[in-house]
Amino acid sequence: MHKYRTHNCNELQISDVETEVKLSGWVHRRRDHGNLVFIDLRDHYGITQIVFTDQNPQLMEDASRLRYESVITVRGTVVARSEDTINNTLPTGHVEVLAVEFSVESAADTLPFVINTEKDAPEESRFKHRFLDLRREKLHNNIILRSQIISHIRHLMTASGFTEFQTPILTASSPEGARDFLVPSRMHPGKFYALPQAPQQFKQLLMVSGFDRYFQIAPCFRDEDARADRSPGEFYQLDVEMSFVTQEDVFSTIEPVMYDLFTKFTDKKVSETPFVCIPYNESMLKYGSDKPDLRNPIIIADVTEIFRDSDFTIFRENIKKGSIVRAIPAPKAAALPRSFFDKMIEFAVSEGAGGLGYIQFSETGEAKGPVVKFLSPQQLESLKATASISNGDAVFFASDKKEKAAKLAGKVRIRLGEELDLLEKDCFKFCWITDFPFYELNEETGKIDFSHNPFSMPQGGIDALEQAKTTEELLELTAYQYDIVCNGIELSSGAIRNHKPEIMYKAFSIAGYSEEEVDKRFGGMIRAFKFGAPPHGGIAPGIDRIVMLLAEATNIREIIAFPLNQQAEDLLMNAPSYVEDKALKELSIMLSPSARKNAEKE
């Protein structure tokens, strides 16, 4: 007989009755019934009930003193449970093991929180004792699910002709839009490596190297603040790059992967392929967001022209100054109490708006509300037609400069979807957002900057760049840039790449970079492009966000084995931490006085 186990704790069935077995695991629960002691023994696979009887009083007494989460090995005989004690919620619920002997492999101290329930525990304690937290069923299953998803992704990608690569972790800084994690070089004092924000340049260089289809389950490092769907330090993505492809080729390659994943690991309805494509400008108009949740049926409409010549002075004057008006329908909300509309106004104000106009259209078509008296009957009918409003609906209005009005309307749309319970249930709705602006105005400097990935190919190529003379014309340029969105969550960005040096130099010069700066920052890739680069493109769906959706987790930390907390700390391993002066000297690093003071305190 094996030293620790002959079976796992999810394995024994009626067919095993009268078999002598050995099991090992953690004490999940213990129940003392006087002449009987029951222990639920748990391992990675499941739970088996162990019974100790008064036929062996010492063994039963020893079992009654076992602490929860102690690790034990039990030898005994499988017996059938009586009809009234069968537990149909367990795969092993028709049997139990009558213990003959047990040994304690490792006794547990007093637990900082309860393991055998999903009851919330303080997050700090959970992170400090993550090894205990990971024993809890839901979190344990999430980590298993993550492994299964990644394994299936590898299978799908390999079956589609992709080759898996590993790219460097120690590399140079790149302009991915976030702060780098820097690693000082001992051999080159004063110089630093950067942990990759993404393997962007390496995967493009692999295409230039003659490989055709690349993928990697890639670790990415960005010094960002934590969010519910974003880790503050490290995340993983399905990094993909392909040679000789158009935007549509990327779509037709990734869509089956997403569809297969989401249909395999959930019973919910999944968008059929091909996924709907929505141009960026249309998405901002209809949904007030570049990551729309298509489970929400509300579609925003532009009603600027209706208010341009209206008697509603506030909107009319705003329009004269360049503002717009967006209408956000609220289906079947006309009869709701005044408190609902007041709550929506409070929400808009909390989002920075001056207020939120609205109109209610009764079931008979009567219009009422603070805006009604400023509109003619013809304007009201035009409003209903333009915004697809029916009798019984209400409609809210957002007026501001184009970008602000669109974003406010989008937030109101989301809030209405929640308040009115409009979201379609039990489904995953995918879409592509395409034709992103190539440039944007930097809010801090007021200068032209790249909107997304600077390595994207501008639509129209170098001709489009050279023909755009004014700031307005530059801001109208679009890129072969695309996002894939599911239920309002951006799963990935991707692009057809700029593989021509002359276009890259021109694109960067418009954003204020000289050729020398481009060569300095991206010399390796520029050099490669001068020796025959294929047209190529790619995408990088976020593994963590995919797992979050499939696990129905509300926080990214619930699908990562050892995450950082919101302050980017690892409370289990005590990272980040101060290091000895000797190590700093080897790296030619000197702490600032304030940092030195903090180090001395520790």
From Swiss-Prot:
L-aspartate binds at residues 176, 222, 452, 497. ATP binds at residues 222-224, 490, 542-545. PROSITE patterns: AA_TRNA_LIGASE_II (PS50862). It is found in: Cytoplasm. GO terms for molecular function: aspartate-tRNA ligase activity; aspartate-tRNA(Asn) ligase activity; ATP binding; nucleic acid binding. The record marks 33 as: Important for tRNA non-discrimination. Homodimer. This is Aspartate--tRNA(Asp/Asn) ligase. It comes from Rickettsia africae (strain ESF-5).
